[in-house]
Amino acid sequence: MAQKARIRLSGTSPVNLDGVCDQVKAIANRTGVSISGPVPLPTKKLVVPVRKSPSGDGTATWDHWEMRVHKRLIDIAADERALRQLMRIQVPKDISIEIVLQN
C-alpha cells in the first residue's frame, strides 16, 4: 500500500484558502500524483460578546465580534517530488498548513 499525505488547511480568509488549494492541485497535476479533495470541513465560528460602554455604567448594551475559521482537507499520494514542491508554496500569514504522512 502506498503512503499518502493528508494536508489540512485552515485560515480566516476563504479566498486565500482556496488559492492555496489551487496551488496544491496544480502541483499534484504537474507531478502526476493522485489527489483527493479539497474537502470543505465545517467552519468554526468564534463569537466574543463585549460591553459597548467603556466604564461599565449605563445600559447593558453588547457588541458581538466574530471570527470564522475555514478548513479544507486534501489527500495526496506521498511522492517525494510533490512533497518537496509543497514545502516551497508561498502561504499567506492567515493560513496554517498541517501535513501528516499515513500508510
UniProtKB/Swiss-Prot annotation:
GN (gene name): rps10
Keyword field contains Ribonucleoprotein: yes
Family label: Belongs to the universal ribosomal protein uS10 family.
Domain of life, source organism: Archaea
Keyword entries, A-Z: Ribonucleoprotein, Ribosomal protein
Function comment: Involved in the binding of tRNA to the ribosomes.
One Gene Ontology term of the molecular function aspect: structural constituent of ribosome
GO cellular component, one term: small ribosomal subunit
Protein name per its UniProtKB record: Small ribosomal subunit protein uS10
GO biological process: one example: translation
Subunit organization: Part of the 30S ribosomal subunit.
Family annotation (NCBIfam families): uS10_euk_arch
